[in-house]
Amino acid sequence: MEKVFNFCAGPAMLPVDVLAQAQKELVNWNGLGTSVMEISHRSKEFIKVAEESEQDLRDLLAIPDNYKVLFCQGGARAQFAAVPLNLLGGNTKADYVDAGYWAQSAVEEAQKYCTPNVINTIIDVDGKKAVQPASEWALSDDAVYVHFCPNETIDGIEINDLPVTDKPIVADMSSTILSRKIDVSKYGVIYAGAQKNIGPAGLTIVIVRDDLLDLASQTLPSVLNYGVLADKESMFNTPPTYAWYLAGLVFKWLKSNGGIDAMETHNRKKAAVLYDYIDQSDFYRNDVHSDNRSLMNVPFQLANPELDTKFLELADEAGLKALKGHRVVGGMRASIYNAMPLEGVEALVQFMKEFEEKYV
């Protein structure tokens, strides 16, 4: 079978080793004669999966003891509502840092429950999109928390600064979690949809500081209530057990491959290979300033957009899948999350060279 590299922004590719283990264990997990997706979430066997998964994630991210780790459902979009409903505590104002589509989506949901102070941080630097330094963000004095999305997958923009504030910082890390080292203690809440760097769609990770667990609105549905979910150890209702199991396999894969430090080195190398080729070419371009280029999502355009369809068609035939850019911006996008090997990026660059030589 021809080797295929999946550049989809999400659901994204999973590590081959993880898929192979899941395949091997699919119909007879741990000698039980059943699949792990068929056993009770309250069985001792699955409780072990849950506990090991949480501990492995804590180890990888060095999560302090005064934080709860929740394995939730509903995707990051559910958290757009859950965050204000859990954190406002009767107040009405929160700061929202806007660097792109996903931050704006969070604002649209949050304004049903509070008055967001929206801080537009995108600026132009030498004709490229960049992010205003955090020290210049116009944060409000009376905001309950500051929300931001460190990586905008559609525009390929990464925020490298943290908000300068003494308020709880809330981060949508759906596309960056586990890709590079972070200091969890600097955040009040971190949430992430699983389908990029954690596992398959259907699972959402929430990491929340203990002192923020008792502020929820009285009308908040229990399935979104951080305090309820923490008290019930993420089993208030039946969790997505198979997605949880696969996430656990990914965590073990990460640990066995050197942890977050090794993964960050790997990711920076991959991104550099692709950006370096784009920058030296007049045939391709990337519109993001080098200070804010995403490690995970690399959008690029052709000098002649009429060739987009041909590029995507031939790339697909070459085993380079899902390179079409988001409908909002068009062009191409290569999502190179943790599971993407350097070999895949090198194959893409080689294809780009050959395509350029043929159609320049």
UniProtKB/Swiss-Prot annotation:
L-glutamate binds at R42. The modification N6-(pyridoxal phosphate)lysine is found at K196. The keyword Cell division does not apply. Pyridoxal 5'-phosphate binds at A76, R77, W102, T153, D172, Q195, N237, T238. The keyword Mitochondrion does not apply. Pathway: Amino-acid biosynthesis; L-serine biosynthesis; L-serine from 3-phospho-D-glycerate: step 2/3; Cofactor biosynthesis; pyridoxine 5'-phosphate biosynthesis; pyridoxine 5'-phosphate from D-erythrose 4-phosphate: step 3/5. Its EC number is 2.6.1.52. Gene3D superfamilies: Aspartate Aminotransferase, domain 1 (3.90.1150.10), Type I PLP-dependent aspartate aminotransferase-like (Major domain) (3.40.640.10). Keywords: Amino-acid biosynthesis, Aminotransferase, Cytoplasm, Pyridoxal phosphate, Pyridoxine biosynthesis, Serine biosynthesis, Transferase. It catalyses: O-phospho-L-serine + 2-oxoglutarate = 3-phosphooxypyruvate + L-glutamate; 4-(phosphooxy)-L-threonine + 2-oxoglutarate = (R)-3-hydroxy-2-oxo-4-phosphooxybutanoate + L-glutamate. One of its GO terms (molecular function) is O-phospho-L-serine:2-oxoglutarate aminotransferase activity. Its cofactor is pyridoxal 5'-phosphate. Homodimer. Belongs to the class-V pyridoxal-phosphate-dependent aminotransferase family. SerC subfamily. Catalyzes the reversible conversion of 3-phosphohydroxypyruvate to phosphoserine and of 3-hydroxy-2-oxo-4-phosphonooxybutanoate to phosphohydroxythreonine. This is Phosphoserine aminotransferase.
